[in-house]
């Protein structure tokens, strides 16, 4: 990853896209639970529950379709299960960084269960803009996800999920140098 803000810059075998351009499709396909993420903006996810990440290098058009000339990145999130459990994780750091991530897994019945996650990530800016004192590079992100699994029969499982991310930031700190 190397993009600014929430735009991913993913390269596989030298093929990728650094900056967001609305008219250009990225050369590396990103898939979240099998769903294609069509643009690089918003492709940096603040996922709390990741089960697996697969990196498939080289052209993947046969399996994944267009926009995978460089390869594909497949992210699989954890599914709800039969166990009642939960956890909370907190990270503290410099520049007033506070990250809080939480998850709870609830079996509602023998064949219906849910998994809920919520994360709040915040950090103050690391560069002060000289003319107005605004901190640049600050980040305040909230993300959440609710996933449900219905085991209809021995042969049929139905998985449903919905998620959101809200990102409030002043943008990256960029300094122009006079030459």
Locations of regions flagged by a protein language model:
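Extracytoplasmic beta-strand/coil segments of soluble accessory domains associated
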Residues: 1-35
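Flexible glycine-/small-residue-rich
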Residues: 14-16, 32-34, 57, 77-79, ...
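Short acidic/polar hinge/loop motifs at secondary-structure boundaries
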Residues: 20-21, 27-28, 33-59
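Outer-membrane beta-barrel translocator domains and adjoining extracellular loop/strand segments
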Residues: 43, 126-134, 171-177
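Flexible loop and strand-edge segments within Gram-negative outer membrane beta-barrel domains
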Residues: 157-179
């Amino acid at each position: 990853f190397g993009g600014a803000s929430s735009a991913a810059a993913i390269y596989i075998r030298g093929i990728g896209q650094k900056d967001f351009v609305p008219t250009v499709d990225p050369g590396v396909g990103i898939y979240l639970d099998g769903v294609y993420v069509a643009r690089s903006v918003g492709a940096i996810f603040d996922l709390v529950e990741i089960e697996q990440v697969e990196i498939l290098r080289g052209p993947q058009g046969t399996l994944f379709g267009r926009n995978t000339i460089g390869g594909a990145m497949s992210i699989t999130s954890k599914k709800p299960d039969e166990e009642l459990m939960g956890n909370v994780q907190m990270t503290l750091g410099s520049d007033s960084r506070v990250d809080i991530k939480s998850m709870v897994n609830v079996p509602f019945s023998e064949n219906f269960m849910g998994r809920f996650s919520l994360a709040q990530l915040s950090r103050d800016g690391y560069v002060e803009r000289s003319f107005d004192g605004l901190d640049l590079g600050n980040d305040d992100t909230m993300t959440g996800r609710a996933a449900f699994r219905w085991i209809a029969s021995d042969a049929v499982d139905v998985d449903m999920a919905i998620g959101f991310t809200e990102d409030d930031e002043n943008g990256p700190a960029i300094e122009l140098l006079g030459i």
